[in-house]
């Protein structure tokens, strides 16, 4: 049975992550209070951040941006979108 957490992002009790996503205090906070569903939303948001800012995953600065964006996404008021971001056209 999945470990349940009161998800800070989605505001309800949902299955938690199976492991800490980052080896630091932020990773522990996410593990303790973010659900699998919210993590899936984050992965989509982070892909958008990587593409819009043209970040290189191997660049150490990308890791710092990842942590800042994750902190804002999960625990801040609202996640910031890149200034020139345009959502993709809807399918349908």
Swiss-Prot record:
One Pfam family it belongs to: Iron_traffic
Origin: domain of life: Bacteria
GO BP of this protein: cellular response to oxidative stress
Gene Ontology MF, one: iron ion binding
Keywords: Iron
GO cellular component: cytosol
Transmembrane segments: none
InterPro entries linked: Fe_traffick_prot_YggX, Fe_traffick_prot_YggX_sf
Family of the protein in this entry: Belongs to the Fe(2+)-trafficking protein family.
NCBIfam families given in the database record: PRK05408.1
Function: Could be a mediator in iron transactions between iron acquisition and iron-requiring processes, such as synthesis and/or repair of Fe-S clusters in biosynthetic enzymes.
Protein name, entry field: Probable Fe(2+)-trafficking protein
Organism: Anaeromyxobacter sp. (strain K)
